[in-house]
Amino acid sequence: MTNELPYDFMKAEKSAAELLRKYGVETPEHIRLEDMAYDLGVRIVEAPLKGAAARLLRYGKNATIRVSNAERYSTRRRFSVAHELGHFMLYHGHSIEFVCSDFDMHDWYQAKGNERIANAFAGELLLPRFLVEKRCDVKEVNFEPVKAIADEFQTSLTATAIRFIRFCPEMCAVLFSMDSKVKWVYKGNDFWPYIRIGKSLDKRTLAYFFFQGKTLPNDPEDVDAEAWLDSDRLGDLEEVVEHSIGFSRLGAVLTLIWIRP
């Protein structure tokens, strides 16, 4: 799937962009979620949440966002708050309560329906296009610029990688794998090869070694193109650049694939 967005996504991003303009955001440091929420009539509290990462309770024009107090990572907490603000601003459904599981938060791009739209809102709110796009104009695709953006904007590597692929002018894609299988793929507009969701990782990929208990290399490496891509559609393409990072806590791998010019 390329990064051409459906109408609901564009509407969500527009709503987030309007919020950023309202509060005069000009730098990453200006994205103060708690201050925005307070002004919007939304209270943020931490509380035990069984089976949920966050919960939005709406009452009239106001709301409370409950964030799991078990969440140890500030980047995930920020995404949870931004995600719930998306539900609040976009008036999702008629229920007064929305419960978002850790699955909804973890599968940034794989989520369905309103969860996916709230993720789009959160992506623009935390990683605004007008600030991020120029930082994605790189000559070589790897996780170094992604990490730099994530550190600057206090965002997760997964959310940042998706925005990076969205705006990077190079031919690239980001993949997420669990249980030695490709779970989801997000491709840049010019990334033409097909990558099948659900395919078992080829033994020639770097990501495969993570699930064999081996340490992934720190740097990108050239791998056979057909190890990742549909071999019937590759033409003269023989190699791609792969950079993979493993998450031991999640049992997952995030991978950048780049086709050199």
Question: Residue locations for each model-derived region?
Answer:
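Active-site hotspot residues in diverse enzymes, especially metal/ion-binding acidic/histidine motifs
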Residues: 1-261
